[in-house]
UniProtKB/Swiss-Prot annotation:
Names of required cofactors: Zn(2+)
SMART domains reported in the protein's UniProt record: Lactamase_B (SM00849)
Up-regulation conditions: Transcriptionally regulated by SdsB.
Known EC number: 3.1.6.21
Keyword terms of this UniProt record: Hydrolase, Metal-binding, Zinc
Name used for this protein in its record: Linear primary-alkylsulfatase
InterPro entries in the record: Alkyl/aryl-sulf_dimr_sf (IPR038536), Alkyl_sulf_C (IPR029229), Alkyl_sulf_dimr (IPR029228), Bact_Alkyl/Aryl-Sulfatase (IPR052195), Bds1/SdsA1_MBL-fold (IPR044097), Metallo-B-lactamas (IPR001279), RibonucZ/Hydroxyglut_hydro (IPR036866), SCP2_sterol-bd_dom_sf (IPR036527)
Source species: Pseudomonas sp. (strain ATCC 19151)
Gene3D superfamilies to which the protein is assigned, alphabetical: Alkyl sulfatase, dimerisation domain, Metallo-beta-lactamase domain, SCP2 sterol-binding domain
Residues noted as binding Zn(2+) 2 in the record, renumbered to the chain: D46, H47, E170, H213
Residues where Zn(2+) 1 binds: H42, H44, E151, E170
Protein role: Alkylsulfatase that cleaves the widely used detergent sodium dodecyl sulfate (SDS), which allows the bacterium to use SDS as a sole carbon or sulfur source.
Length: 528
């Protein structure tokens, strides 16, 4: 909360309405001034989902409250969980330890701050956006906005020149080594760009820095020190990874070679590996520059994992000997080796209870020993999967809960029809559509948009507009489409009840819709 002369500015709105109402109650103990502006520093759910705890859509529509963000934020919000939504939500559940027991969460935090709490997610689109920078006055206070891509591509910071205060968003991630790569999966986070953004923050020479995770930093020299050490750590990881890449080292070799020097590794707490790690940052840097192929042609067309495991087990004397060795490694505290050995047996037989038990126990040991919260969560969630506690409806329910945070009903209102239909392209099932050549038009009169989705023998293409020669057409309001996306309704239900107007042969439309795979099946990440 920034208390300006004429009102309040709220920078980021928390992970849910429930939690943010508690925050607002605390703010109201300090000031009863009206809220004049909201700032979204970037599109991640824990920074935007609680907005309606602070303001209403009516206040924003009337102009009473302005919402500031970088110009790409809205696109990022509506696309973050769409194209790769099913796998991203499952992986996010593992990263955040969503299904862990209270016992496994006890005394834990999120690595960069307190654990997030589930609750109602809301969203209101920005009213004021900019590309690179914006100098303005909000509620009588001078504010300088600056776009600084780093932890997110749309990251922005605020500088209050009259107070010499820098609100650094997640360019600094609080008391932890920054997460140059996130295990849940994101597009390449460029360390060079991140370092440049940190240098832009240093140029402010702020007296106080307020990160969106972690404690404020006071004193110009201390602010400079934290920013400099953070940029040097990221630069060191990047530069030394590239240096050794250029000598031919591969990811498995790089992670043993690239380590922070003592003056950086020991800079507590800001560079401790609570959230990011050097090892998984190194791997993504290699991948970002060179891709998956490491140079050994044996990887071009490898033996399938299950067959490879079968051959290795035979070479090692059979399943029993392999699992005896895995059990022996576990008892000796060599948990990584125990997990790897038992994994071969699981590759051959997913229902091998002894192998799953050894691997689960090994992962629990590795998780409890890990200082990094992301690694810990992945180990323990994977152990749950191996123990049979994260299957079927349980896995689907967890995925649904995560999806609700990434794509709430308010966000769906802002999801363009184009994005929704474009997702169909990657849902086409070649077995069902191999002999089909049909096109279906989608008309949305309330937003004056029309699109055509064409199926051509296993390939789908989305086109703008509807050619008069296309005989099949669905006409519906975008408002109704929003309820289809949320799962409240369906196109078939709309056709039966009159919310969707159907033109063309119903059997052809049924054939067309049958070309796509919309089944949400549980995804196993560890038992493979």
């Amino acid at each position: 909360m920034i208390e300006a002369p004429e009102g309040l500015i709220i920078v980021d709105t928390g992970e849910s309405v429930d939690q943010s109402r508690k925050v607002l109650a605390e703010f109201r103990k300090i000031s009863d001034k009206p809220i004049k502006a909201i700032v979204y520093t970037h599109f991640h759910p824990d920074h935007i989902n609680g907005v309606k705890a602070f303001v209403s859509e009516e206040q924003v529509k009337s102009g009473e409250v302005r919402i500031y963000a970088q110009e790409t934020l809205l696109d990022n919000v509506v696309t973050q969980g769409s194209l790769v939504g099913p796998i991203l939500t499952m992986r996010s559940g593992y990263s955040f330890g969503v299904a862990l027991s209270d016992e496994d969460k006890r005394d834990m935090n999120a690595g960069l701050g307190p654990l997030a709490h589930e609750g109602a997610s809301t969203f209101i689109a920005p009213t004021d956006t900019f590309r690179d920078s914006l100098d303005t006055t909000i509620a009588g206070l001078k504010v300088q906005f600056l776009h600084v891509p780093s932890e997110a591509p749309d990251e922005i910071v605020l500088y209050l020149p009259d107070n010499r205060v820098l609100i650094s968003a997640e360019v600094t991630q609080g008391p932890t080594l920054p997460n140059v790569h996130t295990l849940r999966g994101t597009k390449f986070r460029d360390p060079v760009v991140w370092v440049a953004s940190l240098d832009k923050l240093r140029a402010f020479q702020a007296d106080v820095m307020v990160p969106l995770h972690g404690q404020p930093v006071s004193g110009r020299e201390k602010v400079e020190e934290v920013l400099r050490m953070t940029r040097d750590a990221i630069a060191y990881i990047h530069d030394q990874t590239v240096r050794w890449m250029n000598k031919g080292l591969t990811p498995d070799e790089l992670v043993e070679k690239v380590k922070l020097p003592p003056h950086l590794a020991g800079y507590t707490p800001y560079l401790r590996e609570y959230y990011g790690t050097v090892k998984h940052s190194v791997r993504q840097i290699y991948q970002g520059y060179l891709g998956w192929f490491q140079g050994d042609p044996v990887d071009l067309d490898p033996i399938p994992p299950a067959e490879k495991a079968r051959r290795l087990i035979a070479l090692m004397g059979g399943r029993d000997k392999v699992l005896m060795a895995a059990g022996d490694a576990y008892l000796k505290g060599d948990w990584q080796w125990a997990a790897e050995l038992s994994g071969y047996a699981i590759r051959v037989d997913h229902d091998d209870k002894l192998a799953r038990d050894i691997k689960a126990r090994s992962f629990r040991r590795l998780g409890y020993a890990s200082m990094n919260i992301n690694w810990r969560n992945w180990y323990l969630m994977s152990a749950m999967e191996l123990e049979g506690k994260l299957e079927g409806d349980v896995a689907l329910e967890m995925s649904r809960r995560v999806r609700a945070a990434f794509l709430s009903p308010d966000m769906l209102k802002n999801l363009p029809a184009r994005i929704f239909l474009q997702n169909w392209v990657t849902r086409i099932d070649p077995e069902k559509s191999g002999d089909v050549e049909l096109a279906l038009g989608f008309a949305f009169p309330d937003i004056d948009e029309a699109w055509t989705l064409e199926v051509r023998r296993g390939v789908a293409q989305l086109k703008s507009g509807i050619d008069p020669a296309v005989p099949l057409r669905l006409t519906l309001d975008k408002r109704y489409l929003d309820t289809v996306i949320s799962g409240e309704n369906s196109l078939l239900k709309g056709a039966l009840l009159g919310d969707v107007k159907v033109d063309g042969n119903l059997l052809d439309i049924k054939t067309f819709l049958g070309c796509f795979d919309f089944e949400d099946a549980p995804i196993a990440l560890t038992v493979r």
